[in-house]
Amino acid sequence: MNSTSTSDVIGRRVEVNGEHATVRFSGLVPPVAGLWLGVEWDNPERGKHDGSHEGTVYFKCRHPTAGSFIRPHKVNFGVDFLTAIKNRYVLEDEPKEEETEQIVIIGNKPVETIGFDSVIKQQSQLSKLQDVSLRNCAVNGAGDKGEIAKACPNIRSIDLSKNLLSSWEEVIDIADQLKHLEVLNLSENKLTSPSSSPSPTGTFPTLKVLVLNRTGVTWAEVLRCASGWPVLEKLYLESNNIIISERPTDVLQTVKLLDLSSNQLIDENQLFLIAYLPRLEQLILSDIGISSIHFPDAGIGCKTSMFPSLQYLVLNDNQIAQWSFMNELDKLQSLHALSCTRNPLTEGSKDAQTTRQFIIARIGQLRTLNKCAIEPEERRGAELDYRKAFGNEWKKAGGHQDPEKNRPNEEFLAAHPRYQALCLKYGAPEDGELKTQQPFLLKNQLLTLKIKYPNQHDQKVIEKQLPDSMTVQKVKGLLSRLLKVPVSELLLSYESPKMPGKEVELENDLQPLRFYSVENGDCLLVRW
């Protein structure tokens, strides 16, 4: 049992054949003689019972199959922090039959030594360490007081994930000796709740990044400890079954990134409790099951006072199925980047490009969507396509090209809160843009079009047959080869006998001709 006495093992974290558990019981289990340890496994499938044996309850487990009885000699209680560091980072000299003479420099004078170099090497290796990874190294605590500070005083980043730390007090004993600590990963350590008094202010005076994924930490524990993280900027709380039960008061005010992914009990009302963290710039809400959001303090076309600094929002793997969700995100005053993959809204559509365009059009200040930058040309095309796609619905709801008569009803404005702004930006859609497309038949595939060059009087009007499925980009490519003009310089529009005096620009290179309702007999206008 690694020299650990049986009197102080309750609550200790242990490792058995690569699996981690917490000791819940130590004693006799009749009728079998000898000492047993009752453990609750992190993986409930590893156990056999709930802590009971032949009708007697020896300890309790959260899961009915998470418990086991194990002989003490099979249990690993781990090692202290410094031992783990030496095991991982100190290069031991190979054993030699005879010690060889070594030369070291003390001051400016070379000195001959025998066997002294290994001590210097160890001290040098440890004192230089800044970034330390001790993941799954069975670390159980700080060890002798002050030894960490003496051996490795320059550590700035530690990965202590999946170790045998069992309490916040053990973590504090380590951190107190590392005066430059900025990054700490405690994921997959099952830490017991701190004492009723909060962590001493200044326990982690330089800590900027704290990772507590899969630790079982509660929101109340986070707030209780947070006074000890006065300059914390990034906090990761993934997979903890967290319920946000109260608003942070005088804590977490410096946090810029908060990761609450895979906490399936969080809903929109709980999110409002963290909506006024003043410096929160990045919020990660992947896989929390959220399907709706509404900012009650902001009406149509207005910005919410909630999440005032939020720039990047991650909503992957949720249950978002309604466009109203995107409309609400437009109310966030600082939102510039959104990731929203693997949601019913984005996965249900056969046309991923159209879905992307509609998200861009609905969130006016967005600069990045799903990690892809939104260039000005893409935004313009997306907004024009969106304006056209819902133009007929806008007219039926009371929309009109004449500003004096343009009064769409409240239902339309609620469904499309940016539509009026887009009409002001680009002009209201003309009737010609809103023509109903003809059914896609074989005879409609080829269009006979005239091609004119309004600014090039020496160019003759020509006639071409083009598929109505041909994209604007491919039309430009064809004309570029024909005219010996770079694609980037070409501007396309068209006019139709059905719309005398009107000219429709073909702004989006990715759309086919039929999207713009180009028909037989229409005329392409090419400028450069």
From Swiss-Prot:
SMART domains: CAP_GLY. Supercomplex made of cofactors A to E. Cofactors A and D function by capturing and stabilizing tubulin in a quasi-native conformation. Cofactor E binds to the cofactor D-tubulin complex; interaction with cofactor C then causes the release of tubulin polypeptides that are committed to the native state. Cofactors B and E can form a heterodimer which binds to alpha-tubulin and enhances their ability to dissociate tubulin heterodimers. Interacts with TBCD. This is Tubulin-specific chaperone E. The lineage of its organism: Eukaryota, Metazoa, Chordata, Craniata, Vertebrata. Tubulin-folding protein; involved in the second step of the tubulin folding pathway and in the regulation of tubulin heterodimer dissociation. Required for correct organization of microtubule cytoskeleton and mitotic splindle, and maintenance of the neuronal microtubule network. The modification Phosphoserine is found at residue 496. The gene is TBCE. It comes from Bos taurus. Residues 27-71 form the CAP-Gly domain. One of its GO terms (molecular function) is alpha-tubulin binding. Belongs to the TBCE family. PROSITE patterns: CAP_GLY_1, CAP_GLY_2, LRR.
